[in-house]
Amino acid sequence: MIQVEEAYLNHLIYVSEHDVLTGVLNRYGLKKKIHELFNPDGEGYLCVVDIDDFKAINGACGHMTGDLVLKAFGQSLCGIRNSSVARLGGDEFFVFVDGIKEEEDIRKEIKALEDRVNAIEIPELGDIKITFSMGAHYFKGNIEEVKAIAYSKADKLCYESKKKEGNSVTIC
């Protein structure tokens, strides 16, 4: 009986920290993970990522296909080295990349992400290609800077990428 209760408790903890559709972290799980990983001398990148024209995908292909896109895209994001990935809502994701210091290294990770996304096969999409816009902001320092400043900057960078007709990455 104790094993059943423990398994149920572990399930409840998992569900409280993860997005049910995509399997990536939710906001609560991300906040907890960042606090677990972060140290005062930490550095890396905070990224905000949106799927381009996701509403059009839902409109043209239906919400079930949209759900498949979200799930596949979330799993593609999980391939970023040293990352914690969360779905913030809708088609917006947050990626905390720990320990990558050089812009060249984050660009390599983003290129690999583009390759993974291009390889997603969902027959219901037909000729529609999945593309994304991303803002990536380098951070160094304490958790308060990450929460207060870096997220805001990454979000603005993502918005700038979207204004460039999508399928774009802006790094700062």
Task: Give the residues covered by each predicted segment.
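Core hydrophobic beta-sheet residues of small sensory/regulatory alpha/beta domains
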Residues: 46-48, 171
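PAS/PAC or PAS-like capping segment
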Residues: 51-52, 100
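N-terminal membrane insertion elements
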Residues: 1-6
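Conserved long alpha-helical elements within nucleotide-processing catalytic cores of c-di-GMP signaling
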Residues: 17, 26-45, 52-79, 86-90, ...
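Catalytic-core segments of nucleotide cyclases and related cyclic-nucleotide turnover enzymes
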Residues: 107, 137-170
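Amphipathic HAMP/coiled-coil signal-transducing linker helices
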Residues: 8-25
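GGDEF/GGEEF active-site signature
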Residues: 72-140
